[in-house]
Amino acid sequence: ILIIGGTGYIGRKVDVVISAVKFLPSEFGNDVDRVVFVKEEDIGTFTIK
């Protein structure tokens, strides 16, 4: 499982999660099945763990 880690709240709105996924390298994009700790101001600053 690839997890996008940020510093916000679990369960943010789906549109924010989708926006965050767009910033992933394309080779990971289709393999993401969990996004946690998403905060709008953190979009684009995520790391793969």
From Swiss-Prot:
**What are the UniProt keywords, alphabetically?**
Cytoplasm, NADP, Oxidoreductase
Class in the EC hierarchy, top level: oxidoreductase
Q: What is its main location?
A: cytoplasm
Annotated residues that bind NADP(+) are located at G5, G6, T7, G8, Y9, I10, G11
The subcellular location is: Cytoplasm
The EC designation for this entry is 1.3.1.-
**Does the record bear Protease in its keywords?**
no
A single GO CC term for this protein reads: cytoplasm
Gene Ontology MF: a single term: oxidoreductase activity
Record keyword Lipid biosynthesis present: no
Say which family it is in.
Answer: Belongs to the NmrA-type oxidoreductase family. Isoflavone reductase subfamily.
Task: Supply the name of the protein.
Answer: Isoflavone reductase homolog 2
Q: Which organism is it from?
A: Pseudotsuga menziesii
